[in-house]
Each structure stands twice: as C-alpha cells, then as structure tokens.
C-alpha cells in the first residue's frame, strides 16, 4: 500500500520550496502527498521561527493531530524547519507525540530518519548545518514543482547578524549553491512548465560562488536566466541593501525578463534604530540604492519590511520611518510589532510600551494601505501584461499577476493558464485588480 504524507508549511517562500523538495525526497521511499490530515501515514510540519509564538503554533498543530488520530493509528510526526533547528531537544522532551525533528539544512536525510524510526521506534534528530551535502543531494533529484511560477533556492543562511533576527542561528552562515547546479534546476523547472522563476535566499543578493577562478554573482545568474527562451519572468527575494551592488542594479537596464519590483527590507527610517538593529547600512545608503535603481529603470517600484516598536524607538524615530515611506512610496510592505526572539541580542532589551507600538503600527499600516489603494486605483482603465497562474476556486475566473506581483482576477479560458495575456483593468481594491481579457488575447487562445 502506498504511504501518504501530509505537509503543512508555515512562513517564508523558502519554506515552501523546502516542502516541495522534501516531498521530492520522500517519494523515493514510497510516499505520495495527501491534502487530508486523516489519511496521512506521516504528518510533517515545516516551521518558521521569525515571528512570536512560533513554538506554540507547533504544539497547537500537534494537538489537532492528536485529536484526529485519537482512535486511529498514529502517523509518524515530523517537525521540520527553523523551530526544529532552534528547539530540537526541548520539543522531543515536551511533546512525546513528535517522532522526528529535522532542521532546514538536514532535510536531505529525512528518508534515513523515517526508515530508522520505523525500524527502531526511537526518536530521530537531524539538526546539523550540512548545507553542501543537502544541495549536492537535491541536485540529483528532479525538481517536480511545475507551477507556472516556481521557487528556486540559490542561497541560504546569513552573516549579517541583525540583532532581532534568528536566521543566522537557524539557517547557519551564508552558503551559495554552485552556479551550474542552479542553472540545471532552472532548466528542469522551465521544461516542466514554469514561466516565472523566483530566486530565493535569506540574503539572496549576497549570492557568490567561485569556480576555477571565476566568481559568479546574482547578476550572472539573472543574465543567464534571461537567455532562457520559454521563461517569461524572473524575480528574486529577499535582498539586503548592503549587497545591492552596481552590477546587480545594471541588470535592470539590460534584462527584459527581470521584473521591476524590488523587495528591499529597510526595517526603520531612523539611523539610530538601524544602528541598534546592527543593519550595517544607513538611510542615506538605502536611498542611494533606491535612486540608482530608479535612474536605471524609472518603472521600478519598491516593497519593504518594517519593524515597529523596536527597543528605544521614540516618536522622532517613528516620524523618520513615516517620512521614508512618503518618499519611496512603497507599493506593498509588511509591518510588524517587534517581538523578541530567544538567543538574539535584542531579546535582552527593554520593550517599547506595547500600547504605543500598536498605535504606531496602525498609523504605518494605514499609510501603506493607502499607498496600495492609490497605486491600484491608478491602474484602472489601463491594459496590463498578466501571467496567468491558475483558475479561481469558482472554476470560472482566472488568476494571474502583473509585473509588480499584484493579483489580477478576470474571466478567461483555462487554456490561458501559463501564458502572458493582456487584461484591461476595470476595478480594484487594496489587494487585487479586476478586469477583462483584451480582444487580442482572446484571439490568441481561439
């Protein structure tokens, strides 16, 4: 009988990529994927440790699984990802229902862990930083993720050690995959139907790989991918302002496939706070990158991340953040109240009054919300290029994205999926655009 695995993924796009590759791996020992908890022989939770209460989410999910399988045979329970890396021994002690914990740099060993557990009925723990072995192994397994828009990890870990961040401790130091390994996986994705590839890394623009005296950087990868005939779009995330080098910026001038949306987290508009965060750049340096990019390609827009209520943030610091938002006019951003992560420098700092932090968060989110509304409203009555990704749940409308990652919903034929079409925008809200196929796009399908 074929074994079934249920995979639930929390957190970033890299976790989504990891979950896909975990499934590619466990297929080798006979697993197929199920979307139903109750059918699973193996339940895997791929976790994120960035936000507050990450551990408690894990225990809550395990509690749900316990209830479902109260009168059924217990599945193998695997906790993977960054929470597993950070809390491995504690998790195994606190929750006996967990059978295996496996860190993000060890999931190539998941088959061995599962088979050992089945044989010995003992808890298994794999949490070594073994990034080279992981990617060498994964390069031998075909990436079956054939979505129209597909993720591709090129770099992992971080050496920046921002004082609020757990990534250096859960993902390890910066590691860049071999250039040819990435290109080969990209070719597989395109051959499987991918029209857009999103390059991933905790610090993706720090990508640097030396081979026989040749140093490859992110710009080299982008230029190579730009030459793929059947690939329509290229994106990358997440970037650090310090690594936004001139060679990378110049690709925005020459590439027709690199999308004009740059996700460039800044976290705060105050140099005082950036210094306390150990961000290793100033607002002036951030704005210089912004100006260079806009000069190279005036179509470029920006999105960002903001941490509100970081220790010692005062009204003047917050005002500077609001001024930065007004200047750059980010079209999409993520903002959160600071939550201390165990093991980081900031975990030991005095918190800003939570009432003040919540008030500031409401103000900044309203500003960012209005920016999005204004941007989307400006697109009404315009014709946009949309990459069609899938059909909506109603089975009638189609879903796609613009160059700026904005969702577009419209009536269309399923034969449009995977194609670039032109859509006339009729209306909008904060998150989405609504439109209709142009006559020329209808004729192409017909």
Curated annotation (Swiss-Prot):
Organism encoding this protein: Pelagibacter ubique (strain HTCC1062)
Domain TRAM: 377-439
All residue ranges annotated as the Radical SAM core domain in the record: 144-374
Enzyme class name: transferase
Subcellular location: Cytoplasm
Names of required cofactors: [4Fe-4S] cluster
Protein name: tRNA-2-methylthio-N(6)-dimethylallyladenosine synthase
Role summary: Catalyzes the methylthiolation of N6-(dimethylallyl)adenosine (i(6)A), leading to the formation of 2-methylthio-N6-(dimethylallyl)adenosine (ms(2)i(6)A) at position 37 in tRNAs that read codons beginning with uridine.
Keywords recorded for this protein, A-Z: 4Fe-4S, Cytoplasm, Iron, Iron-sulfur, Metal-binding, S-adenosyl-L-methionine, Transferase, tRNA processing
Pfam families associated with the record: Radical_SAM (PF04055), TRAM (PF01938), UPF0004 (PF00919)
CC terms in the record's Gene Ontology section: cytosol
